[in-house]
Regions:
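Conserved acetyl-CoA binding element of GNAT-fold acetyltransferases
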Residues: 48-64, 115-116
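Conserved beta-strand-loop-alpha-helix junction that forms the acyl-donor binding cleft
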Residues: 91-102, 117-118
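Conserved beta-strand in the GNAT
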Residues: 22, 30-40, 56, 61
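Active-site rim helix/loop that mediates acceptor-substrate recognition in acyltransferases
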Residues: 1-25
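Conserved acetyl-CoA pyrophosphate-binding loop and the N-cap/start of the following alpha-helix
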Residues: 66, 70-78
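A conserved beta-strand-loop-helix scaffold within acyl/acetyltransferase catalytic domains
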Residues: 36-46, 50
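Conserved acetyl-CoA-binding loop of GNAT-fold acetyltransferases
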Residues: 88, 104-114
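Conserved GNAT acetyl-CoA-binding A-motif
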Residues: 76, 83-95
Length: 118
């Protein structure tokens, strides 16, 4: 983890605004082989959606030796279930091209988001 990220992450975990999900191997000496996070974002309500929290899924990663086993999907499903349990109706993420199919199978669709780096 990047050192300057630690204080940011610790604050959000303590506030309950960041949830982490990990998958470990079985056995006496388990290893974390996959994980991801859910950032709960304060969001302005609109006439289309009065909900004031959105979920942003980030840092989904699977160790190379454990890929192609559905672990990224399981991590993402855990994030989505956490959203549902909190009544959150919108979840977003940014996907690597290689992972796009995983998210599309879960119902994610491309949007019209644009970005400008300042």
């Amino acid at each position: 983890m990047v050192d300057n990220c630690r204080p940011w992450l610790h604050k959000r975990v303590a506030d309950g605004n960041y949830l982490g999900f990990l998958i470990e191997t079985a056995g006496d000496d388990p290893l974390v082989v996959a994980g991801g996070g859910l950032l709960l974002l304060d969001w302005p309500p609109t006439h289309l959606d009065p909900q004031t929290t959105r979920g942003y899924i980030l840092n989904v990663y699977v160790e190379p030796a454990h890929r192609q086993r559905g672990l990224a999907r399981r991590v993402t499903e855990a994030c989505l279930e956490a959203c549902r349990a909190r009544g959150i109706r919108v979840a977003t993420l940014h996907s690597a091209d290689a992972a796009r199919g995983i998210y599309e199978k879960l119902g994610f669709a491309a949007t019209n988001e644009m970005r400008l780096n300042l």
